Design a protein with these regions (language model features):
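Positively charged n-region of N-terminal signal peptides that target proteins for export
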Residues: 1-4
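N-terminal signal peptide c-region/cleavage motif recognized by signal peptidases
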Residues: 12-14
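Thiolate-centered catalytic microenvironments shared by cysteine-dependent enzyme domains
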Residues: 78-172, 200, 259-275, 279-282
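C-terminal soluble interaction/assembly domains
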Residues: 235-237, 242, 247-298
Length: 299
């Protein structure tokens, strides 16, 4: 496994230096919405987009940027770099684009999953997330429009051109996770809610529990009641309480590699080096030869 993208994360052995913030505010978007290179990606169910969206936005779903799922295959696996690039170019995204991703209602983790996909495509320094999504946008009087009234809906988008170097190394694979279960400086972190981590509820997965030695940090503890990312000070305390130390490389996972991207970006905002185990519990729980822990008891 290669190191994560140099230059986008900064960390030291005893303290953290904050990285550039991926979040933008509604006030920022009000000021910049008319810029030529701005691309808005709306994450939500199609009916919500049809009813209202920020003018000029393009509807997108995390599955649009994932391998089409065959029966029995893992859920929501990131597209190979060339296919991911071509898909994003089809949205009109190019090297000069500034992409702002937002959710329509409360889809925080699907939105961070889309943002992660852009980062893996090499566009991390040109990607932002609208903090609080469309509810926050509407709260400041931001304009919304129905698809039937949006003139941009009838305009065929010109494909973009992306030459940025992709970064598939931001995805940790199964072998990397197995090799680093007890490695110093590597924190395997489970972003699912507690009942799934403890193994009291298997959900839809073959086995219940968590990866041995993993830290528990439910993704929903990182966002406020109105679906904004918590402050850096609050997030620092949450990570410390979960047993994560400054300088650790965080490998986040969840059910299918979506909720874990909330943790991924929360950690990056603090300057941690972060990776996503894309296979997540969907993959680990299928491998009956791999150990699991339930309530700290290895099985």
């Amino acid at each position: 496994m290669k190191n994560a993208l140099a230059g986008l994360v900064f960390f030291a052995s005893t303290s953290l230096t904050f990285a550039a913030d991926i979040l933008v505010t509604p006030a920022w978007l009000v000021e910049h919405r008319g810029e030529r290179n701005l691309v808005l990606l709306h994450v939500g169910v199609p009916a919500e987009f049809e009813r209202e969206h920020i003018p000029g936005a393009i509807p997108v779903n995390p599955q649009d940027l994932a391998i089409p799922r065959a029966e029995g295959a893992l859920i929501l696996q990131l597209l190979p770099p060339d296919q991911l690039r071509q898909t994003l170019e089809g949205f009109g995204i190019g090297d000069d684009s500034h992409v702002v991703v937002y959710f329509s209602k409360d889809w925080v983790s699907p939105t961070t999953r889309v943002a992660f996909s852009l980062e893996a495509a090499g566009l991390g320094d040109r990607t932002s997330i609208l903090d609080g999504g469309m509810p926050a946008w509407k709260a400041v009087g931001g304009a919304v429009i129905a698809s039937t009234a949006d003139p941009s809906s009838a305009i065929q988008r010109k494909p973009g051109k992306i030459t940025a170097k992709p970064h598939p190394e931001l995805v940790a694979d199964l072998d990397f996770v197995k090799a680093n279960l007890s490695a110093p400086g590597i924190a395997i972190v489970d972003a699912r809610i507690t009942k799934f981590f403890d193994g009291t509820d298997p959900g839809t997965m073959p086995r219940a529990g968590h990866i041995p030695g993993a830290h528990s940090l439910p993704f929903d503890t990182l966002v406020t009641d109105d679906n904004r990312m918590k402050s850096r000070d609050e997030t620092t305390k949450i990570l410390e309480a979960a047993g994560i130390k400054p300088g650790d490389t965080i490998v986040s996972y969840c059910h299918i590699g979506q909720q874990a991207t909330v943790l991924y970006f929360a950690a990056k905002r603090l300057g941690y080096k972060a990776l996503l185990y894309d296979g997540s519990w969907d993959e680990w729980s299928r491998k009956t030869e791999l150990p699991v822990e339930r309530n700290a008891t290895r099985r």
